[in-house]
């Protein structure tokens, strides 16, 4: 679609999705990209650039006393909004501790909350997640919370004051895409806060499916960082998100069991 | 001899670390062979705000954590 054309039903003239508003902030891109698992800073920077993202997730870890190497030292912090995660935390207390350290690191009040329940699946601990969400919101944090695809938990997290609820499409890093589109649709229908699909994206079509379901955005890391060509995959993810966003608003056709001719059935030669 | 008695052990990022008496948090951070983007310091599970790094003196047996921002998803 050219930039001079107008999307029906939308007063804006554009060829990209509208910006995403979360709490009191607006982000130009709905694709949130993780900064983990890159082999080198050059590839990371090129992939982030190709993805068009504004929000990048980061982790808080002990400094490596034996090596000063840190890819993030080469990240252009002026260009991106850093969203610290609590990855690796298996209880609410540890997650809250990481959020407070993040604040001390100068990263502000925005956090991606993860309280994990199991090392093999990395699925969230719903009880610890809810507890940490409540406490962090009370402490003034803006909490974007990683959740399972359970619609009841998603509602509880919204009630606890989450800025965004981020259900997993499938387990973190699994590349299985969207496994339970029914549950995700229910979550999307029920919640008022923006829902971002987080985790499990394997390839571009997964992002499109998430957006077609009605997600406000997608967060991914391994799908890009682990691809053979991360920069090309980042490019694909960006366009997949746009495709899904437009498709969700375009009004798709109904599915039918049998064919329906696309060309006129009248005036066929030989009849 | 006196040097020896002026040194003591702390836990730094989970490992035993020797420091001189009267070392401040700021001294410790500056002595580390690291070039982090930013650091935050915890002393015995309590954050030491950056504004207090210079005046906070580390004591024997303290558990010090020095953390930074790294790549993550």
Cite the ranges covered by each PLM segment.
Chain B
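Ubiquitin-like/PB1-type beta-grasp interaction modules and other compact soluble beta-rich domains
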Residues: 1-72
